[in-house]
Amino acid sequence: MSSYLRSFIFGLLTISLAQCSPILKDTKDTKFSTGSNISLKKRDTNVFDSVVDTINPASYFGTVSHPVTPAGVSTDSLSSPIETNKFFDNNLLGSRTNFMYADPFRYWWQSSDTMGGICIAHTDDNQRVMDTDDTIPSYYYEPIGICSLGFGASGITSNTDPIVDEIDQMSARFTFSWDSSSMQLTLTEGMAVTTAVYTNAIPQIFSSTLYINDFVEVPGTSAVQKYRVTMSDNHVWLIYIYGDSLTLTESTSQMLVGSNTFNGYIQIAKIPLGDGTAEALYDTYAGVYITGISISGYVEDAVGYYSFDFTTAGDTSVEPLFFLLPHQVDTAVSGTKVTSIVLASLVSGDMNAAAGNSITFAEAIPQDIGFLPWSPTGGQIGYSEEALEIIAEVAGTELGEDFSANSNLNSMYYSGKVLAKYAMLCVTINDILGDETSSEQCIQKLEAAFARFVDNQQIYPLTYDNTWKGVVSVAGLSGDSLADFGNSYYNDHHFHYGYFVFTAAVIGHIDPDWINTGNNKEWVNFLVRDVANPSSNDPYFPKHRMIDIYHGHGWASGLFESNDGKDEESTSEDYNFFFGMKLWGQVIGDSDMEDRANIILGIERNALNKYMLYADGNVQPTSMQPNYVAGITFMNKITHTTYFGTNIEYIQGIHMLPITPISAFIRGPSFVLAEWNALLASVIDYVDSGWRSLLYANLAIAEPEESYEYFSSSDFNTDYLDDGASRAWYLAYAAGLWANDAVYYPVSSSSTTTTSTSTGSVTTTSTTATASCTLPISYTSTPTTTSISGTCNGATFDASLYVCDGTVLCPIVNGVSYQNCNGACYNPSQYGCDNGALGPVQSSSTTSSITPTPTTTSSITPTPTTTSTTTTAQSTGMQLCGSNYYDASSYYCDNDQLCPIIDGVDYLSCNGACYNPSQYVCSDGSLSPNTVTTTKATTTFTPTPTTTTTPTPTTTSATSTNVIAQCGSAWYDSQSYICYGNILCPIINGSPLLACGNACYDSSIYGCSNGALVAA
């Protein structure tokens, strides 16, 4: 280990100790049972109705009209934002007759002269179509086109198109009007009874695919009239009539017709097959119907609460029935009575009907997960000497890449991935390596690359679509609707924009001044608003375009019709957006945005692990469990594949990328390991693309040692690294989770939250703090477990190892209690503290101690810093060289230059280069061999910087001893590299590569013309 890195690590340890943060430990579990009557104290602020911004995006992006216009939308509604990824969108596109999937029912407009209106369909699990070609089924779907019952009326024909209005994130209203008559239905997700409101109309109830086996009038309810109808598939439906007097009669085996013109409403509900109690429950809750659903929410401690608040009509003295999905049944805590009525959902397991005007749910949230790796086991993130060295080396290589050129692509998706790669690199350098100089260089390069997009100068700029109201790429507006994965048609916006929001959060984290510079904040907020605007008070975007709070995850597809409804191909890019949004809210100080994202992430962990990731407690068919992930989840179908191929690494991997600190919150270690052992371990050696490294990075969640060994291998093949992935970050992620032989523990935000179980309750955790970092002396491998005997600024500590000075924990080292000086801990026998600044104690008996973190260079390897004065009296202990303190046992200060002491020899300075005076002499700023010394001569090159583009270096005789030289701001070994201006090029087999522009090249293969490489 180099003396540079040793000093660097000790400096980091000093800073880490001074900034110890609490590691959260479980002390007590608070269980909220389903249907309990606990009192919830809500905050004044509803984070689901907090405006992000109201700036008109057209003023930044300009505006266009979209080539696809909403079909059937009322004139008044056209002026408002229109949802583009919701269950009812098929009715706004194309022929408008495709299916609308409002779990647990399917609806569609049946355009007909004889049976026109809205069809209702529901199928049970035994009607599901399963893949029978494979031993492990790769797909299933629910049969479509079965019109169990439908609402119609005399006078509705194929020319009577429904008008859509009252469009919201969970509902829309459909109105058929003819002459002076109308039929109106509000369709919502989860509604247990379907209601049609009639005005001056003769109702018709029909089925275009089934026949009526039995139809009877049933007395004894609050309804004007009630009927029970049994269809030819043996399913039983109930019909309730409210309003004017009306009698239904069976006109044909497929049609019930009203006796007269009617003003009122009719409700239809399905009795689960064989359920003898459901009818009485429906009778209790009939008469009321839902016309709208609003969402509210807040965060309290480490729990996120969200509520569905229903707007109702009809008999509002009655609470409405509403179907809950499995992840909601597990977490409902207030406002509802869960009934025994159970219907199968489309692809999300069994649903329970619950009664209530407002239903509140509680989810454990990732409140303390930030930019550093997070351990799902509650372990401490730590790094060994070896890991830090390898991470630094790899990060230095990646830092040399051209951020701007690599991210200047013709796709928002791919550009975003590259930017996020470099964001993770900057996090690695800044938060883990603690290299301020390289961090500054990294973030400046990242800001420059990001600026192209803020300035809207990318290959395909963004524009504001004034038709549907959103920010889209221009790539597909004039021809290919699938350009950039359909971004122009609102497909995958959460996948695309999540990378940009995450990158912006990293920049704001490292350089807070950037946030309010120019249009940076507004531009990022435009993306947040496009994907997840929470409020109707923002007139420029629909609410929650890409997230379905009811289902607990996002939907894609946008403005494309689909028989099976919207779909989700990548769970991980879904939650990546909300992780980026959480961090962005944090760095800009928008606590409502941060809380909202935390709640959504808590919901997604629960929902995704029940429906799309086949973890313990998931609801998918047992026969499909060996697939481990759904693949593509449609509203009506699951198929174990991708849109771009059927390789197993594609199907599993698209649910992994990108690997960030939130990954382990969603993807538990047991799930990751089971998936690896069953599907991936046997094929990993045959994966010859960037997917291989992604699979290994994901493995770090369960087996960090194996992941680390892969990424730290000396023969690591960069061909197996995706363009959107940073090897330095993958190393930092795996090494931090492994924490083997750790000597350094970065300030961490680790927390332990208990996932909700499948037994109908949610477990949340209250926490207490213990010290999360310790000072390893002589590089002890792991923190020592000790007894707790003190409290310092909320952190408990062992008073035999630490002292509390003010609010800072400082160590006791060799019996000496270190003291606090403005956040830094110091040995009082070696330092003094004057006005918050450390200074050395001038004493001939001082000994070497921990040094402050040295300023490091752009190559990431920590190095000495040049100074402005000369210190002549050298001795061991801490000395002052200009404004920098250094360990005089390891460095020598000579003429504004810190040079190392190697093998007892004080190296001297010569025009920026450090040299061994027994081997070299310095004359007029140039080094030449010391001819007095007898050495074995070799050929090397002068380290003096040159200024030409492709210079021929001057060779000199030299010894085999290294010369430590400086090139620009980087230090290098002159036997391995040569400096051209500020460009370092390697020496390979004794021959130096030449420089051309910023590239190094072999002159036997290439030439250089005007700063560009050409064939030799």
UniProtKB/Swiss-Prot annotation:
List of catalytic residues: D492, E569, E573
Keywords of the record: Carbohydrate metabolism, Cell cycle, Cell division, Cell wall biogenesis/degradation, Glycoprotein, Glycosidase, Hydrolase, Polysaccharide degradation, Signal
Gene Ontology biological-process annotations: cell wall polysaccharide catabolic process; fungal-type cell wall disassembly involved in conjugation with cellular fusion; primary cell septum disassembly
GO cellular component, one term: extracellular region
The GH81 domain, residue ranges: 45-741
First-listed, main subcellular location of the protein, grouped into a coarse class: other
Spans annotated as alpha/beta subdomain: 273-364
Record region (Disordered): 844-872
Catalytic activity as recorded in UniProt: Hydrolysis of (1->3)-beta-D-glucosidic linkages in (1->3)-beta-D-glucans
Sequence segments annotated as region ((alpha/beta)6 barrel subdomain): 379-741
Enzyme class: hydrolase
Family: Belongs to the glycosyl hydrolase 81 family.
General function of this protein: Cleaves internal linkages in 1,3-beta-glucan. Has a role in cell separation where it is required for the degradation of the primary septum after completion of cytokinesis.
Protein name in UniProt: Primary septum glucan endo-1,3-beta-D-glucosidase
Source species: Schizosaccharomyces pombe (strain 972 / ATCC 24843) (Fission yeast)
Gene that specifies this protein: eng1
